[in-house]
Amino acid sequence: MYLTRTRDIRRIGFVSTRFKGTDGVSLETEKWATVLGRMGYECYYYCGLSDRPAERTMLVEEAYFGHPDVAALQTLCFGVTERDEEITGEIHYLRQLLKKSLYGFIVDFRIDLLVVENALSIPMNIPFGLAITEVIAETGMPAIGHHHDFFWERQRFLMSGVDDYLDMAFPPRLHSINHVVINTEARAQLGRRRGLSSTVIPNVYDFAARPRGVDEYNRTLRADLGMGEGDFLFLQPTRVIARKGIEHAIELVSRLGERRVKLLVSHQERDEGTDYYRRIAEYAGFLKVDLVAGSPLLGTSRGSGPEGGKIYDLWDCYANADLVTYPSAYEGFGNAFLEAIFYKKPVMVNRYSIFESDIEPIGFKTALMDTYITDETVRHVRRFLDEPELRREATERNFELGRKYFSYELLEQRLRTVIMNFGVVG
């Protein structure tokens, strides 16, 4: 890690493809911005899709990975081993457009430090990564590369016609960038593959806040979902994509047999198409499991639907849940796990690699699966449902461990250290 010239840093610009909704990058960015605000910094945003304050945001549509031109390039650049000259031309046309607007963002908002959220980690928007890299290289601007996951962790990015661009920008080797990763395995891989040192800052949660309980607004959620008295609500707080392992949660519910359980998948996003959604819907039907995924009752915030009914947010779902399922095959860290322990809900979790290395050793009490559901997993879940004292002891212990190891206070300490690497003390 390198020291840049000493300078006053007061205005921080977050840069990513989107800052909207409840995906891990958007949620973690909000936490960083909150803590940096408490530390006295002003935060601004550059992205292609946003729900941040408009007066602090520069919105450039081509920065979003779902923009038609960007999505078309993705199809042409991966799953192949070479690219046409026309593709190169389109990449550089978009790169130049984005680069110009990034310079405008830095000037208009008088940015002192860039925090690049995953846009230099995973190539969802290749021109954008190139543009960010060139701006930092040309200005020597202090930057933090906050990496949530890397392209070498995803099968679909391993064959490409853009290896030269991946080497250049995902992530780049530039003296003014301090790299931050969210787990110890990512730190090791970044060192081995790129020769870059990095700081580990795990995902965090505001354990000093008060969790939302069942209130006058959300007490109707169960009835609106068609649940009866004595039914159990299992919450899978993830997107509908294959690595989230929703089929394991379906199997778990099926094996509980005698209990009436509704399995609710909270997120609407299907970033990797609809094939997996169709698969889990058919699987749930085959096993006669009551699955709700992509419900119009759920949104990013409370509100009213087209016909005047209530829209519930993720926190309403947590407040009403009896158990949280988290059977992911892979996670960069595990935001949903922290949310579940904050809301003091029992958790069934798969021992994905980062959980095994960075979270499990802390001593959380959960129902575990290791790649697949076992009789022991089912037995442990049954005990959580049937034994209130066991459930209370586990959830209270988990909350205290979360507060100790994954709090905003820890985030502030780590951010101060990273910012000091730019020669800034304070």
Residue ranges with predicted function:
Residues D386-M420:
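A charged, aromatic-enriched C-terminal amphipathic alpha-helix characteristic of glycosyltransferases
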Residues W152, Y165-T220:
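Donor nucleotide-sugar binding/catalytic pocket of nucleotide-sugar-dependent glycosyltransferases
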Residues P346-N350, T366:
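Short hydrophobic beta-strand element within catalytic cores of glycosyltransferases
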Residues R7-I9, V35, Y44-L113, F286, ...:
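A conserved catalytic-core segment of Leloir-type glycosyltransferases
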Residues R222-A223, M227-K244, I250-V253, L263-L264:
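Conserved donor-binding/catalytic core segment of Leloir-type glycosyltransferases
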Residues A329:
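Aromatic "clamp/platform" in nucleotide-sugar-dependent glycosyltransferases that forms part
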Residues R260, T274-D316, G363:
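Nucleotide-activated donor-binding/catalytic signature segment of Leloir-type glycosyltransferases, i.e.
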